[in-house]
Each structure stands twice: as C-alpha cells, then as structure tokens.
C-alpha cells in the first residue's frame, strides 16, 4: 500500500503485548520507525525493546514508547490489537477505563494522519476499534487476515514436506 517499509512511521496503539514486541523487532529489522502508544504500566517487554533498539540503530530507524495519545501525529500506519489477551481475567470495566482513550476511532485516525489502519484480529468492535474505522477506506484488517492465512498455509506446507 505504501510501496516501501523502510522509513515508514508505524504507531501501535493499545496494550504493549506480544504483538507489540514482534512489531518492534520486525520494524527494527526492516527499517520502520515504530512507536507504541499505551497506558502507564502497559508498555512492551523492556528486554525486547532494548534488543530491538540495538537492531534499529544499525538500520537507521527509531523505536519509542509513549503514554500520551495526543502525540499520535504524522504517522503512516496505525496498528492495534485486542485489549484483553487470552487468559486475562481483568474485569471489562477496568479494561475499558484504562484503554478507552486509546480506542482507534475516526478522530484518532484523523489526528494521526495515517493512511493505513491494521488490527491483527479478533477485534472487539466498539472497544479497541470502531466499526467506522474497521470498515472504512483506510482499513486493511481483512487483507491482513487473508495474507496471514496464506503465510500459515505456506508454513504448514513446508513443515509437512520437510
């Protein structure tokens, strides 16, 4: 969609979880500038961040963690994930209060300047992302899911034929 990865500005918005950790490593390797916007005490794994930052410096890109969602400006891509990971028994009201300022809605997309919105699914519509954005023209959520299907099939084929 953007024609390149090197130099692209990616904002991950939400819980600093395994997806964020993987995005930091992949971004560092591919030369993307990745910033994680998450609430206090919900940042990605510090050890992963430090290691990915070493890679990023070698590849001329930057990684950052930010709690202030008002700083989400001038990004190319917004990426999010579910607010509640498997096995997390935190009450939904507690989760909602903590993460609602980080909801991917049209105002946040407009503020960010992003041309692409991603979500790795499953999505909880009305929580981490609104219907308007998920079904909107900047969303590549379902393309992303289709691509993941093909990747999974290729890995399975390789493993079966190994």
Feature map (PLM): residue ranges:
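Conserved active-site and cofactor/substrate-binding residues in soluble primary-metabolism enzymes
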Residues: 18, 22, 47, 103-104, ...
């Amino acid at each position: 969609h953007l024609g390149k990865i090197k130099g692209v500005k990616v904002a991950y918005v939400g819980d600093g979880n395994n997806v964020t950790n993987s995005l930091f490593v992949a971004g560092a390797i591919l030369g993307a500038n990745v910033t994680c916007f998450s609430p206090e005490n919900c940042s990605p794994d510090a050890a992963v961040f430090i290691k990915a930052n070493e890679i990023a410096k070698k590849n001329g890109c930057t990684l950052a963690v930010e709690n202030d969602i008002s700083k989400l400006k001038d990004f190319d891509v917004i990426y999010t994930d579910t607010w509640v990971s498997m096995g997390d028994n935190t009450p939904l009201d507690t989760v909602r209060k903590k993460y609602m300022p980080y909801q991917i809605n049209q105002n946040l997309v407009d503020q960010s300047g992003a041309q692409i919105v991603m979500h790795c699914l499953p999505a909880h519509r009305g929580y981490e992302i609104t219907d308007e954005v998920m079904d909107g023209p900047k969303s590549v959520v379902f393309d992303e899911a289709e691509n993941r299907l093909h990747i999974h099939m290729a890995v399975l084929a390789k493993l079966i034929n190994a």
